[in-house]
């Protein structure tokens, strides 16, 4: 799934409603899939949408169709445990446990305890790859993502 498509600017809600009518309410059926036991993960489909996990979590929890909203915990699982499991990488990633990679972020608020509508305001205050703190990068998010994909190494 790609929760960021819930508010994708290239397909505004008005446009989808003109074409699909009431069926537009069934787009991105997160809750329906979750309740049927389908393991779903969330991604951004960058560069079509921003590679912003916090925004994806916010959209999954604040889905415009209330019947399709996930809890904050479920939205977090989509980006962590479920993503690792679907990528056949659950032995190394997805949860924090001895022997795993220990890739994680520090946030300025707990998405499980703040009001759901505030999740999108959370800011990342630290990034760790393989349990090593990655200092803030001048290149911003794109540089950090590329570094993470390279296993924590930068090309010079």
Name every feature range the model reports, one short phrase each:
Residues 133-152:
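Glycine- and charge-enriched low-complexity intrinsically disordered segments
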């Amino acid at each position: 799934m790609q929760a960021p498509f819930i508010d994708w600017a290239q397909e505004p809600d008005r446009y989808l409603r003109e074409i699909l009518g009431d069926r537009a309410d069934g787009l991105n059926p997160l809750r329906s899939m979750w309740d049927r036991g389908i393991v779903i993960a969330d991604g951004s489909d960058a560069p079509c949408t921003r590679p912003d996990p916090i925004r994806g979590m916010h959209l999954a929890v604040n889905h415009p169709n209330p019947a399709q909203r996930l809890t904050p915990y479920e939205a977090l699982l989509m980006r962590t445990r479920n993503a690792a499991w679907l990528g056949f990488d659950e032995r190394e990633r997805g949860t924090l446990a001895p022997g795993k990679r220990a890739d994680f972020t520090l946030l300025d608020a707990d998405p499980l305890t703040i009001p759901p509508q505030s999740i999108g305001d959370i800011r990342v205050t630290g990034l760790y790859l393989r349990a090593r703190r990655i200092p803030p990068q001048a290149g911003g998010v794109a540089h950090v993502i590329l570094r993470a994909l390279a296993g924590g190494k930068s090309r010079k």
